[in-house]
Amino acid sequence: MGVVAAVVGSVFAGFGLYQLLLAVAAFGYRPPQATGSPTKRVTVLVPAHDEEALIGRCVESLNAQSYPRELYEVVVIADNCTDDTAEVARKAGAAVLVRNEPEARGKGRALRWAIDRLLAREWPPDAVAVVDADSVAAPGFLETLVRPLEEGALAAQGESLLFDDGSAAAAFRAGAFLLVNRVRPAGRAVLGLPCNLQGNGMLFSRGVLRANPWEAYSATEDLEYSISLLLAGIEPRFAGGAIVQSPAAPSAEAASHQQLRWEGGKLNVARTQLGRVLAGAFRRRDPKLLEVAFDLAVPPLGLLTALAATGTGLTAIGIGVGYLPAWAIVPWGVALGAIPLYVLTGFRAAGAPASAYRSLARAPVFVLKKLGAVPRLLRFRAESWVRTERESGRDR
């Protein structure tokens, strides 16, 4: 049993050390630089379901980009809305596509519907960006996001971050977004590895969308489509500095539901796609695809920490009662040590504010809650577009 405990602990140690490696590598990341005047014609798609409260400021931020105005347009998809999303978006200066197909709900289906219409135009755009309706884009977002495509990439991903409203809960979640959506993709870029799509702040060339139609409809459609592209040999490139920010969920309950969608969705994709990715990696002898499989297998950070702590505790008990040898705890100790080192190193690499460090005082409670959420995470199968609770505006 000592060997079994050590082997399982070694897997968790590998997960922790892998993330620590990415955090260290992130120090070497440099954002893409302009090599000339922009040339790509871009349509920015904004899928929106009942977002009348926030769609106006999103469109305004996109209309204020430093990218040449004649080269881009903002198109809002008012998807199965029961409020005034479409009217607010038009008043803010966006073109609007209204979709009423209640039998085919979901962000992925809305994107496929709109992309098909864009590509059917006589003069389709060179590239299509996707921005969430509750986001605010930094002025240089689009200009920075397009640079990888100007350099020959076929898809790109910017930084999808959260606003820190000053509360401890928001600071904690904003810090987590820094790690997942800035540090890890930056580290992977430095190591020559592809970037996972994050759902918000994505960009695709017209050719990619024609050759690889959007057929990702799960709660984590971004990760699902990432895998489809990677298996097709297309590597999304990270565009650090192309920032879109969204508000944190306004309540603990809303945050819990949001995390369930994201984390449960990732576990569901891992269950259904890990075998395909591994098979593709070995068939093509592709080490990058093997890394993608490993990254897909890494549990969400809170769950990873909870499981590592539990494994360490159980191993320590087994040693204490003489059931396990003392050396069995070594890999578990490595795992439990690598995780906080990853967080602190990642915060430093990301230039995290002091509030992110202070918010770590919430980590023990967060980890305990993760243990209680394991059954729900494993059962998660949501495919409908579940809108996050807002402080204002109608909800579904």
Regions found by a protein language model. Name each.
Residues 1-60:
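N-proximal low-complexity "stem/linker" segments adjacent to membrane-targeting elements
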Residues 56, 83-91, 98, 140:
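Acidic helix N-cap motif at the loop->helix transition within catalytic regions
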